[in-house]
């Protein structure tokens, strides 16, 4: 997600009165311009996202929160911690990964994730495989394509899709279609934040969910209460 939002009332409470229950996970930064909530992970307090209330538009949904994941994507220390959290999911389940396909500026996080996936663990004490990291290229229609020299990293490979945020899953579905088209198999989906639990039968391995952002809602574009209430759009976001 990349967005800039206008001001929201400083006393806006996105949790509908549930702030006390979530107190240990919420931090609040308020200024004249905006209110930003910092949400930390239960598993590692150094890993966090930001949530900003408002009216935001993605490619498939209207949202009442903007989820900021920049620190996890671009801060080295936080990225490493987040990668360890995401990798543990695959270690615990014995899921082997050949290629990490990074969507929406997650290449740095993807590199750390690949490093963690290659490390020895209890289920695989002597790993001998290489995990590749790949960023997508798009054609004029927005489909993911792979040049001849990179197709070998997808064809016949077990692919992990990495993305910052998932709202409806449409972006991941398109990526899965591209992986399948080039002869690969999507065996894992990892996200910093996801509002859904699975896409086309593949469970989403996520650090944060919609439950971590009390009051979070994603609406169909044709049935958005924010639009019906004439609330202006603050920004357009990815995902």
Regions found by a protein language model. Give the residues of each.
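Intrinsic-disorder-associated, low-complexity terminal segments enriched in Asp/Asn/His/Tyr and depleted
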Residues: 1, 11-12
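Polybasic, lysine-rich low-complexity intrinsically disordered segments
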Residues: 21-25
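PRPP-dependent phosphoribosyltransferase catalytic core
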Residues: 26, 31-40, 174-239
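Active-site-facing substrate-recognition patch
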Residues: 26-96, 239
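Short glycine-rich phosphate-binding loop at a beta-alpha junction
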Residues: 95-106
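Hydrophobic Val/Ile/Leu positions in short beta-strands of Rossmann-like dinucleotide-binding domains
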Residues: 102, 161-162
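Short, glycine/charge-rich flexible loops or terminal/linker lids adjacent to PRPP-binding catalytic cores
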Residues: 107-160, 167-170, 221
């Amino acid at each position: 997600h990349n967005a800039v939002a206008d001001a929201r009332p400083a006393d806006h409470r996105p949790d509908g009165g549930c702030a006390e229950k979530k107190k240990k996970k919420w931090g609040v930064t308020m200024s004249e311009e905006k209110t930003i909530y910092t949400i930390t992970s239960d598993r590692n307090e150094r890993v966090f996202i930001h949530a900003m209330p408002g009216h935001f538009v993605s490619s498939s949904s209207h949202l009442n929160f903007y989820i900021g994941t920049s620190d996890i994507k671009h801060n080295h220390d936080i990225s490493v911690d987040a990668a360890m959290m995401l990798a543990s999911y695959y270690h615990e389940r014995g899921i082997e990964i050949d290629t990490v396909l990074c969507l929406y500026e997650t290449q740095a996080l993807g590199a750390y994730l690949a490093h963690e996936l290659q490390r020895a663990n209890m289920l695989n004490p002597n790993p001998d495989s290489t995990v590749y990291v790949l960023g997508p290229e798009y054609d004029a229609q927005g489909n993911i394509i792979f040049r001849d020299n990179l197709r070998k990293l997808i064809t016949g490979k077990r692919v992990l899709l990495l993305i910052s945020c998932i709202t409806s899953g449409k972006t991941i579905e398109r990526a899965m279609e591209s992986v399948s088209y080039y002869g690969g198999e999507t065996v894992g989906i990892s996200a910093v934040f996801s509002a859904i639990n699975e896409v086309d039968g593949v469970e989403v391995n996520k650090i944060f969910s919609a439950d971590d952002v009390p009051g979070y809602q994603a609406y169909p574009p044709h049935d958005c209460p924010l639009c019906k209430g004439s609330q202006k759009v603050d920004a357009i976001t990815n995902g």
